Amino acid sequence: MKKLSILTILCLVATAIFADVSADLSVSTFFTAEQQTAVVNGDILPQMWVKYNAKNENSVESIAIPTTKYNNEDYSVYEVVTDERFFIPYELNDESKLKFYNVLTSYSGLKGMQYYSRRAGKASLLIKKCYRVKSLSDEKLPDITYDKIEPKISNMFLQKDNKLGTLYFKNELFSDSDNFVMVNTCVIPITKALFTINDKNEYKIYSFFIYDAEAGGYFCYSFQVLRVKLDSVLKSGMISPTTFSNRLRASTVHLYKMLGIDKSDKLNPWVGLYDKY
């Protein structure tokens, strides 16, 4: 009886832990009521944070990443964290859902993405080339046009941009009812100004697309996390949170564009702020 009781307690504890880290993919998991209203009205809500805040650009003291079964990880170990909340008006049916799915896996469609350059004070080219690959090679593969939605698919793509050079990402796309979760994990170390700042799998970008029929579209929450293992690089101000916040905003605006929505006037996430070097 005693052994049975202990076993029962352990099972209950395990269940409680699992429930805690596996929050539902609901709008309220990622958005407060005020945030929901703001994004439906057209706002895009960014946050950015970097350890030591050497350039005094952190917009918040910390960023709490909502935890789900798709991102059960301790994000406090990351030295750079940025996130963004936005809303995509979208009429959902079987055909449009598949279209959205294929847009998310259109790696070649990322070529030409622009970001707001503080140095230039205007939009500049971010992604010079992007395409699907099979491995860590330059062998270009065509995008796959899916004719049905799978619970999970995985691909790899190469991305060359004018800030971080050539990167390789593992892309995972999950389908959960009418919702999607996309995870891009950089599978090579990142170099910044000749310094290798982290190891492989230490730069990640998550995107959650939660459909709300009443609102008529997707509530979207994206975040990126980056390890920077050299304190000297962080303390020197070489790593700016705006650099990564602007990258995240670039991907948001480009996704809108791929869906036929012009948000180019939202390319600068920090209008009137952080414009000086």
Can you say where each PLM-predicted feature lies in the sequence?
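Sec-dependent N-terminal signal peptides
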Residues: 4-15
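Generic detector of short, well-ordered, non-transmembrane alpha-helical segments enriched
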Residues: 15-16, 205
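Terminal "cap-and-tail" regions of soluble proteins that handle hydrophobic small molecules
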Residues: 20-149, 194-195, 213-277
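Long, positively charged binding patches that form subdomain-scale interaction surfaces
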Residues: 131-180
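Hydrophobic-ligand binding "helix-grip"
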Residues: 163, 168-207
